[in-house]
Amino acid sequence: MNDNRSGGEGLQRKLSPLNVWALALGSIIGWGAFVMPANTFLPNAGPLGTLIAMAAGAIIMVVIALNYSYMINHFPVAGGEFTFTNASFGPTCGFLCAWFLGLSYLAIVPLNATALALIGRNLFPNLTQWGYLYSVEGYSIYAGEILLAIIALVLFAVFSIRGVSVAGKFQTVLALSLVGCVFLLAIAALFSPHASASHLAPAFTTDATGKSSLGGILAVVAVAPWAFVGFDSIPQASEEFNFSHKKSLVIMVLSILFGGALYVILNTITAAVLPEGYTSWVP
């Protein structure tokens, strides 16, 4: 396939390797990285068990990345999975693939947008919890939280409409800020009086007999595809690369490794830094 674009053909090639890496990492690390350590990772696998599970999940994702890289080099155009399916299996399969992708992304966007309300509720409750509307399963919904989600969606839409160059730079700033903040949080945790290596015991969850639970580790491995979802944004933007598509594999692998590292760091901090009155992460 001819990979050259001229005039008005194709999309603008303005995404650098750093922009693409930031796009993938920013898609991988969402609200789940901050919520799941306490309600999924630690209860199921423990600190060390989570590390093992996320490492296994990262290896699985790298295998998938190898397949993506192969397809990107053969079909270096926008569309990702839809393009690959349509070209390989025909329009019927392509149509089905496009609909499933559309439904999945339609679910992810409001999921992450409304996660801002959860953050605002815990950090700035007086700013967002106004205008009570209704309750769902005992969870109150406020107009202020909905407004926060709408503002975030509009902001990102504006950056996207402005063009891929602006969106790429904005995403890069956000991703680098995210990585920097997590590492600063880790450094602060090391010097916190509430942090101790002894808090990481037990390293694994145990079953009724007191033995380490392999099932718990496998349970975390099972959610790895969800935890790492996002690096698949790279093949979808492949037509906008301003570099060789052969670099896509390295970028995908780096985004997966960074994503896995951030998950493990946040999970370890959650277990090691305990509030007053607690001596272990075990609930």
Model-identified regions with their sequence ranges:
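Helix-loop-helix junctions that connect adjacent transmembrane segments
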Residues: 6-12, 50-51, 127-144, 172-283
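Membrane-water interface regions at transmembrane-helix termini and the short interhelical loops
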Residues: 11, 70-72, 96-97, 151-177, ...
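Extracellular loop-to-transmembrane helix junctions
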Residues: 12, 33-139, 255-261, 265
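The first (N-terminal) embedded transmembrane alpha-helix
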Residues: 17-36
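Lipid-exposed faces of alpha-helical membrane segments in multi-pass integral membrane proteins
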Residues: 25, 29, 52, 56-60, ...
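Residue-level signal for alpha-helical transmembrane segments in multi-pass membrane proteins
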Residues: 63, 67, 107, 111, ...
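Short amphipathic alpha-helical coupling elements at transmembrane boundaries
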Residues: 73, 77-87, 94, 169-172, ...
